[in-house]
Curated annotation (Swiss-Prot):
Zn(2+) binds at residues 7, 10, 33, 37. CDD domains: Ribosomal_L24e_L24 (cd00472). GO terms for cellular component: ribonucleoprotein complex; ribosome. SUPFAM superfamilies: Glucocorticoid receptor-like (DNA-binding domain). PROSITE patterns: RIBOSOMAL_L24E. This is Large ribosomal subunit protein eL24. Keywords: Metal-binding, Ribonucleoprotein, Ribosomal protein, RNA-binding, rRNA-binding, Zinc, Zinc-finger. It comes from the Archaea. Binds 1 zinc ion per subunit. Binds to the 23S rRNA. NCBIfam families: PRK14891.1-1 (NF034186).
Length: 67
């Protein structure tokens, strides 16, 4: 059984055979679940500032802010 990948940008798990794998020149492997995540990563957007990412939700819990 194939292993599910986790998006390097939003943190969402996605099925094998979908998404995109990007290998940087230093050998680090990045997985993207969608074109949206890939585009935001290369534009330099901070995932902690976008509400739909797992990084935002974890940072919000660490700050203790609840709405």
């Amino acid at each position: 059984m194939a292993r599910w990948n986790v998006c390097s940008y939003c943190g969402k798990p996605f099925e094998p055979g979908t998404g995109k794998m990007f290998v940087r020149n230093d050998g680090r492997v990045l997985f993207f679940c969608s074109r949206k995540c890939e585009r935001y990563y290369f534009m330099g957007r901070n995932p902690r500032k976008l509400k739909w990412t797992k990084a935002y939700q974890e940072a919000r819990l660490q700050r203790g802010i609840r709405k």
